[in-house]
From Swiss-Prot:
Any single GO CC term annotated in Swiss-Prot or TrEMBL for this entry: ciliary membrane
Protein's name in the database: Uncharacterized protein C16orf52 homolog A
Entry-linked Pfam families: Atthog (PF18800)
UniProt-listed InterPro entries: Mosmo
GO biological-process terms attached to the record: negative regulation of smoothened signaling pathway
Source species, domain of life: Eukaryota
Length: 167
């Protein structure tokens, strides 16, 4: 196993962890209002009213966000399989070829999720329009983690494909 394979494996693992964390954290969209802060996630929606304890419930997701969640979960599975194949490439060199294609599939799935997610900004909890959030609403830390997972997947693919050779 060469250094570039190890680097790409670490990048894919980081992307995998960031994607899992982005789903687990209910901060994809944050209203940040002082009276009642609302954070909307893909698996939980939390609200804090006037400094009381935070209350979290499962959200009713629009079809666009269900599709986004599906694509992210499939991307996570792809990256997990990729990491396994890169470990297996220590013994069977041809596993690297399959790992690259599966990682590429994961990148496509993540990019599709990133394109579809903003279509769901129209829901009542957010109050925006497709691809346009209201002025008082921002994307949260979970969305940033998800974008980082896309970035690490792309850079990992560059190293796995030996496109980004050092020196």
């Amino acid at each position: 196993m060469d250094k570039l394979t190890i680097i790409s494996g670490c990048l894919f693992l980081a992307a995998d962890i960031f994607a899992i964390a982005s789903i687990a954290n209910p901060d994809w969209i944050n209203t940040g209002e002082s009276a009642g802060a609302l954070t909307v996630g893909l698996v939980r929606q939390c609200q804090t009213i006037h400094g009381r304890d935070r209350i979290c419930i499962p959200p009713r997701l629009p079809p666009e966000w269900v599709t986004t969640l599906f694509f992210i979960i499939m991307g996570i599975i792809s990256l997990t399989v990729t990491c396994g194949l890169l470990v297996a490439s220590h013994w069977r060199r041809e596993a690297t070829k399959y790992a690259r294609w599966i990682a590429f599939t994961g990148m496509i799935l993540f990019c599709m999720a990133a394109l579809i997610f903003p279509i769901g900004f129209y829901i009542n909890e957010v109050g925006g329009q497709p691809y346009k959030l209201p002025n008082n609403t921002v994307v949260g830390s979970s969305y940033v983690l998800f974008v980082l997972s896309i970035f690490f997947t792309i850079v990992g693919l560059l190293f796995a494909g030996k496109v980004c050779l050092p020196g």
